[in-house]
Amino acid sequence: MFNIPAVAVSYLIGSLSFAVIVSKYYGMDDPRTYGSGNPGATNVLRSGKKKAAALTLLGDAAKGLVAVLLARVLQEPLGLSDSAIAAVALAALVGHMWPVFFGFKGGKGVATALGVLLALSPATALVCALIWLVMAFGFKVSSLAALTATIAAPVAASFFMPHVSWVWATVAIALLVLFRHKSNIVKLLEGRESKIGGSR
């Protein structure tokens, strides 16, 4: 009965674009108007405002975490199924990528996906975070780190997540993140992708 409202609330939480909100708070340009045009922490970092980038990263991860944790806490009182929790997780990411509050022009979903995974399975999130860190420090390319961690997510989920529906949600999340990184994949293949902190 409460499945659809829960998914809708999760989508609305996901639709809060912290890159835009934080940038506006600091009097910065809209991140959709410079760099890669992506409203995410990496692009905000291109403005030179490290604090704003950090707050964007934390905010985007937190909204994914909060949306799913809220559903999990209320799962029994509201009678939400495990599949409903999976749908809530996916809705938070969809909200980030296509936010109703910002003209459906959102980010690529890496931080929000991490927050979602943390709420579903801390072990899965930890594996992905460690892979991202190793790749980011090793190659200094944010998109490469994100893509590697994204590909690893469903594999880790299959080991650590207690419900099959959550594993399939992780597969869907990974596919969405990969889809949103299609331009980055092309740049990586062509050797044109920018380094972390670069201007492109």
Swiss-Prot record:
It catalyses: an acyl phosphate + sn-glycerol 3-phosphate = a 1-acyl-sn-glycero-3-phosphate + phosphate. It is an enzyme of class 2 (transferase). GO terms for biological process: phospholipid biosynthetic process. The chain crosses the membrane at residues 2-22, 51-71, 84-104, 114-134, 159-179. GO terms for molecular function: acyl-phosphate glycerol-3-phosphate acyltransferase activity. Keywords: Cell inner membrane, Cell membrane, Lipid biosynthesis, Lipid metabolism, Membrane, Phospholipid biosynthesis, Phospholipid metabolism, Transferase, Transmembrane, Transmembrane helix. Its main location: membrane. Its EC number is 2.3.1.275. Pathway: Lipid metabolism; phospholipid metabolism. It is a multi-pass membrane protein. Pfam families: G3P_acyltransf (PF02660). One of its GO terms (cellular component) is plasma membrane. It is found in: Cell inner membrane. Belongs to the PlsY family. HAMAP family: PlsY (MF_01043). Probably interacts with PlsX. PANTHER family: GLYCEROL-3-PHOSPHATE ACYLTRANSFERASE-RELATED, INNER MEMBRANE PROTEIN YGIH. Catalyzes the transfer of an acyl group from acyl-phosphate (acyl-PO(4)) to glycerol-3-phosphate (G3P) to form lysophosphatidic acid (LPA). This enzyme utilizes acyl-phosphate as fatty acyl donor, but not acyl-CoA or acyl-ACP. This is Glycerol-3-phosphate acyltransferase. It comes from Neisseria meningitidis serogroup B (strain ATCC BAA-335 / MC58).
